[in-house]
Amino acid sequence: MRLPEQPGDGKPENETKGDQETPERGEEPRRSPAPDFPTWEKMPFHHVTAGLLYKGNYLNRSLSAGSDSEQLANISVEELDEIREAFRVLDRDGNGFISKQELGMAMRSLGYMPSEVELAIIMQRLDMDGDGQVDFDEFMTILGPKLVSSEGRDGFLGNTIDSIFWQFDMQRVTLEELKHILYHAFRDHLTMKDIENIIINEEESLNETSGNCQTEFEGVHSQKQNRQTCVRKSLICAFAMAFIISVMLIAANQILRSGME
């Protein structure tokens, strides 16, 4: 995921050495190769039905009266539902709130090694009522305007990803070709390494939960179709979550830079 580039070659001069150190001015959150976390630290595999993703079949889908509804007026039902599903993925314990610990685990699963300072800044940005956790209205109020103003907003709609997987299914492209198709569609927000990490993580999650993904296919080719459907559903959530994290990282980086000036 790309953060705003600094003057010069765009590379940070120093890396964050520990969780308690404050990043230098203009420094990006520390990246690492795909980490080998224990199973319990991997992103949970959520089985999402197409109805939930594309038809808006959520209870209490409307934003609360306290949210800035005027800024979010241009958010489509599909975008709102995908943001809500990404929120559910981040909310590991399902209590309706995102904690700093849950946010940290989500970022680490995508290869980011945020310091405690960076996590605190992101949480402060999201936690509008100061209760130490983030509910969906707070999450949406911060993310919504960013999504509306994003040039790549259409790329994160589920039907775009479905179109990509239609090419994968019908043209029988290789996994390497699929990576390049995904990179071309999402390169404004994701690097090739991001895409590879997401695919690896989701494939591992699928293997660990094989047999639990409920799909509608039956017959001779059902196993292959079920597997592709489960991977696609999981990737939709993963890409939406990756976009959300990239937005939060940009906001955190801007706050860090402004605080140093």
From Swiss-Prot:
Gene Ontology molecular function terms on file: calcium ion binding
A Pfam family assignment: EF-hand_7
Organism: Rattus norvegicus
Extent of Basic and acidic residues compositional bias: 8-33
Domain commentary: The C-terminal transmembrane domain (TMD) is necessary and sufficient for membrane targeting.
One GO CC term, this protein: trans-Golgi network membrane
This protein's name: Calcium-binding protein 8
Topological region Extracellular: 256-261
